[in-house]
């Protein structure tokens, strides 16, 4: 096989043909290694904690890793509920209060500091209680929502380990989309641009 002209010019005269083939092969391998080093770097520029940020509505440089990996902070799903009169908590305990269909629940800030996200339901209303310890913000979302394929689903949320302006970015396990707690909107993934309905929540004791 003929050696490309650009490469043959770079090879001094008098070198045996076998040696020139070795040089040619070495140049090809070097080029492949260089491409292998470049491609992962460009891909990692739009991926953080395993989330694809290529269609993010936010600048990916402003999305920061909070420390834990994806699901490094364990979100709760359908936690056990106990009556208020059986609760060992003091009356001064800070909680997020939820009222749906004349049913009342209190989610303690103490435990929300640990878990940040609680997926729960009252009758047919599925919802997610979210709390960002850095901002002190508690937001309640209705999670019965239409997906991009037109189907209806109950989104189940987890903690991404990512922050935007020091605020919690959740993700839904249904589509792996990232959601901003403050804007109640998907900022990347298949659900990008979709808004989550919010429900009243009370910061109280």
Task: Give residue ranges: language-model regions.
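Intrinsically disordered, low-complexity segments enriched in Ser/Pro/Gly/Ala and basic residues
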Residues: 3, 7, 31, 41-43
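Residue-level detector of alpha-helical hydrophobic segments embedded in or interacting with membranes
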Residues: 7, 11-12, 35, 74, ...
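Bacterial N-terminal signal peptides
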Residues: 26-38
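Intrinsically disordered, flexible peripheral segments
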Residues: 41-205
């Amino acid at each position: 096989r003929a050696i490309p002209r650009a490469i043959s010019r770079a090879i001094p005269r008098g070198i045996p043909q076998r040696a020139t083939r070795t040089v040619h092969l070495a140049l090809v391998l070097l080029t492949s290694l260089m491409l292998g080093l470049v491609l992962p770097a460009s891909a990692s520029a739009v991926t953080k904690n395993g989330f694809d940020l290529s269609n993010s509505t936010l600048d990916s440089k402003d999305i920061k890793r909070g420390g834990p990996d994806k699901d490094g902070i364990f979100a709760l799903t359908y936690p056990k509920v106990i009556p208020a009169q059986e609760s060992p908590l003091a009356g001064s305990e800070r909680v997020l209060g939820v009222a749906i269909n004349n049913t009342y629940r209190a989610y303690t800030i103490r435990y929300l500091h640990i878990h940040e996200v609680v997926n729960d339901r009252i009758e047919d209303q599925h919802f997610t209680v979210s709390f960002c310890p850095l901002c002190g913000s508690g937001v309640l979302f209705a999670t019965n929502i239409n997906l991009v394929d037109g189907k209806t689903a109950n989104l189940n949320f987890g903690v991404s380990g990512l922050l935007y302006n020091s605020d919690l970015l959740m993700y839904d396990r249904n589509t792996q989309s990232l959601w901003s707690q403050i804007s109640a909107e998907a900022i990347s993934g298949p659900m990008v641009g979709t808004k989550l309905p919010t429900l009243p929540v009370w910061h109280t004791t």
